[in-house]
Amino acid sequence: MTRDTIPLAGVIGDPISHSLSPRLHGHWLRRYGLQGHYVPLHVNHANLETVLRTLPLMGFVGVNVTLPHKEHVLSIADSVTDRAALIGAANTLTFTANEQIQADNTDGMGFLSNIRQALPGWSASAGPALVLGSGGAAKAIVSALVSDGAPVVHVANRTRARADGLKEQFGARVSPSDWTHIPDLIGDAALIVNTTSLGMAGQSPLSLDLSRLSPPTVVTDIVYAPLQTNLLRDASIRGCETVDGLGMLLHQAVPGFERWFNYTPTVDEDLREAVLAG
């Protein structure tokens, strides 16, 4: 295999130095003995389209996309999957042999796969879901929960208008709520998801009244630094099943790796340890 035929992939963002994706994909490439490279690419908004059109000419087969470019890449892509169009953002770009850009969003799939790996047999159809926050991650997760059969998805946000926007975007099974109503919704929820940055290292804590929280409610947090947030710790103390946020990052990476390197990787404890090792 010549240098020209070794597939190249990467992750684009601004900033990008914090990304765990190079560690993740690098582990898979080494583990499976595959030819390929995965690199971080610091690209600002002004240069985004030029870079994306140039990368296929340099041998790149695709890239992951992180903040702040996940929405803007949709206007650059030549084709967009239905789920990426519905969510309004893409995190995975694939470059075709004729240098076309295909955009997809695998965040929702990664979210569901993370819970199912931790809790085999789990389904969103088990009961109402409560999603905290209404940003980009929330949109992908709400879309996935609705598609997976959640009877109702309550979305609580400090700015009510943003929660209302998700109902307009994803339909009648989405129920917007004020942040102050969270304690009333917790008792009936089969699933509680924190999609905000509250509770992340360096951010303000997530302070909730969990007095009505009890099994069999499942609680998950997309934050993975720390792995056990205060929300997950307190839910565990109350006897609830909890799922940390690292697995969502790992599972959302599977489709891109499969397309770019023609191999289906496994998400397991070895991968978790490699990504967390630093």
From Swiss-Prot:
Keyword field contains Protein biosynthesis: no
GO molecular function, one term: shikimate 3-dehydrogenase (NADP+) activity
Pfam families xrefs: Shikimate_DH, Shikimate_dh_N
Key word Chaperone present: no
GO cellular component: cytosol
Catalytic site: 70
Record-listed NADP(+) binding positions: 82, 133-137, 157-162, 222, 245
Reaction(s) the record says it catalyses: shikimate + NADP(+) = 3-dehydroshikimate + NADPH + H(+)
Pathway field: Metabolic intermediate biosynthesis; chorismate biosynthesis; chorismate from D-erythrose 4-phosphate and phosphoenolpyruvate: step 4/7
Chain segments annotated as coiled-coil in the UniProt record: none
EC primary class: oxidoreductase
Any one of the GO BP annotations: amino acid biosynthetic process
Residue sites binding shikimate per the record: 19-21, 66, 91, 107, 224
Quaternary structure annotation from Swiss-Prot or TrEMBL: Homodimer.
Family that this chain belongs to: Belongs to the shikimate dehydrogenase family.
HAMAP family, per database record: Shikimate_DH_AroE
Known function: Involved in the biosynthesis of the chorismate, which leads to the biosynthesis of aromatic amino acids. Catalyzes the reversible NADPH linked reduction of 3-dehydroshikimate (DHSA) to yield shikimate (SA).
Name of protein: Shikimate dehydrogenase (NADP(+))
Organism: Jannaschia sp. (strain CCS1)
Source organism phylogeny: Bacteria, Pseudomonadati, Pseudomonadota, Alphaproteobacteria, Rhodobacterales
